[in-house]
Amino acid sequence: ENAMDKDEALAKQLPYNEMAKFGWIPETRDSKEKVMNLRKYFEVVELSLLENKQITRIACRRLAVTEKGDFALLAWVQEAKIKARNIETSPINMKELIRIIPEIRTMTVLKPKEFCPKIKRMLAECGIALVFLSHLKGSFLQGASFMDGNKIVVGLTARGKDADKFWFSLFHELAHIILGHTGQMDGTTDQDEKD
């Protein structure tokens, strides 16, 4: 089995059409084109490299765990990484992050258009790029945090309109960062939170 055949099989496990709908990758029906687009998107020479869990070390809040979901998760994380590249951040500063947590907590009563720009700016000053992404079916993801170069990326999903979930996910990811869990192999599930 050659690399293209193997990659075509792997491409079927990714939510290609949904990713294209969000504008993350070009639309196509051709399976070889899909593979080429996905290789470019993930910045790999072969999609089979995505099977190596070391390629993306993340800490995340997931609602379920499925193998197909792992590929959707990788796609979502890659989009967070791409968006974060356009966000200028100061050097990572944990003391400042800990200092601003109480101020961020006071924003829970504000509307998103009021708090989003302010939180993004405050976190950028701590070396954290905050990005918001659409929910990708199969990823069961609420949020993720990981290192990318000299910054920490926090990605949050726009899944659901529940403000409580947003704030829980944001503080959950910030706790991962403060506690040094950024780069954990597996995220937390709803079951973990109940235990």
Where is each model-derived feature located?
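Conserved binding/catalytic microenvironments
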Residues: 50-195
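Interfacial/linker helices and their anchor residues that mediate assembly or domain coupling
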Residues: 2-91
